[in-house]
Amino acid sequence: HNTMNDVIGEYPNNPSSNDQFYDDGEIIRGLFSWHGYHSSADPPENLGGPDFGGDGHLGAAQFVGVATLHADTSPSNNSNDINQPTTTWFITSDDPTTSGNLQYNGTKSTKEYVDYMTVGHPEQSHSEIVGTGNANQFNDPRTGSNPGGTSQGIGFGPYDLEPGDSIRIVLAEGASGLSRSMCYKVGQNWKNQVHTDELPESSDLHQHMMNNYHRSSDSHSYYKNAWVFTGVDSIINVFKLAKK
């Protein structure tokens, strides 16, 4: 229930401050997710999934994500359409539209197509709406509920396909973040409050994550969260490697 989802590169012609770019200057069209705050965490410092009752090691410091490397412009034009994907709305699990497979229900299928597959880009991503709040308490503004947590959606098109036509879309999936040894080192240092001045090298994107998703009131966890959010640069590097 506490997954956080963000999207970058939705508007190639009008990049936002947190958008990223490949070495050749092309915008990265990506989405990534991480372990966010949960209202039931006790103590409420659960970014990175620290082992509160044990040695403090981090059990959920990784970022997972997907990047669009290529999407055909049309069935007859295989040039890369930089404006794809055209839909990046988040999706709440187990609500009436996303639960129950009723492929022959025309009403439900139409709602899936209109509300999820072709809905476009939200004004704010899921993570931008949640901010430093508890991700498990987020409610989808379209339904007013969130029974099963939030996932990131992605949709391409629309394409007009005749019989025999095809579209080529290339995606890269990845996961990255702190190594196992660093998860233990950072978590143990955090729990014992030692060496907390040993902060990671920051980037513009890393600072964006700290500014928007670290609770400034939680000075006790600044060190831990600073290391956890290095995972965002790690997943961007995975996307760049996939492009090569």
Where do the PLM segments sit?
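Extracellular/surface-associated beta-sandwich interaction domains
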Residues: 1-244
